[in-house]
Amino acid sequence: MTQVLLNPSLEEAYHFLVKNMYNNLITLFGDCEIQYEGRAYSHASLASRLIIIKVDGSVIVHEHTKREPINWQPPGSVIVVRKESGVLSIESIRKRPKERLYIILRRLYYLTSAEVNSGNFDIKGTEKDIVDLVLENPNLIEEGFKPIQREYRIPYGIVDLFGYDKFGTPFVLEFKRSKATLQAVSQLHRYYMFFLESYGKARGALVSPGISEKALNLIEKLRLEYIDANRIFDSITNSSRYTINISNIQRS
């Protein structure tokens, strides 16, 4: 079921969000200011923006240009909506690492709620193919990432890709072509601990097109990282070397 409100008042929008945002995908377009506090600090002045709130706690904010959002919060974030004097606020809080996204809405042009079911996401290619893409453009992982060796053999197995981040910290990457599970996190953690004990510092990240809720919780508990491989796949959708097939999407 899909619901749409056009030019809702702040009062209407507040009650709509409280009723729907925990079970449905929310999209809204309105005039807002944004503050972010966490690993850095940023402030986005009043402008019209598209805001997406997902059932898993993800929040994404887009402006009128570029593919990447100007602000976002990952799955597992806690979202609080408040109706304050003359504004509607949406606060997204991530506990670890501690981050806070604060959106102040002054006017809404539309607000939607939709039931969206998960579909299958199949990549016609192997982990090796995805690693090849990263080696061609290391910034797909993050700015300044420097790959050193693929299939790096250690006593606990073979690391898909080993490198260093821009600060010189050893960075272990484990790639999966499908939704990551607890087993994948445990595998990464063994590799990560080896490099942590060997170098005194290390980072470990799991790269996959999806991750189970339990696996994501374990990632955060073990102070590892998750990289959504969809960012990488976006860059290859026009490439003949790979086929991305999304099927079994149910529509209401």
UniProtKB/Swiss-Prot annotation:
Keyword Nuclease on entry: yes
CDD domains reported for this sequence: NucS-like
Keyword Hydrolase: yes
Enzyme class (EC, first level): hydrolase
Primary site of residence: cytoplasm
Compartments (UniProt record): Cytoplasm
Superkingdom field: Archaea
Name of this chain's protein: Endonuclease NucS
PANTHER family on file: ENDONUCLEASE NUCS (PTHR38814:SF1)
Listed GO CC annotations: cytoplasm
EC number: 3.1.-.-
Family, as annotated: Belongs to the NucS endonuclease family.
Keywords: Cytoplasm, DNA-binding, Endonuclease, Hydrolase, Nuclease
Protein purpose: Cleaves both 3' and 5' ssDNA extremities of branched DNA structures.
MF-aspect GO terms: DNA binding; single-stranded DNA endodeoxyribonuclease activity
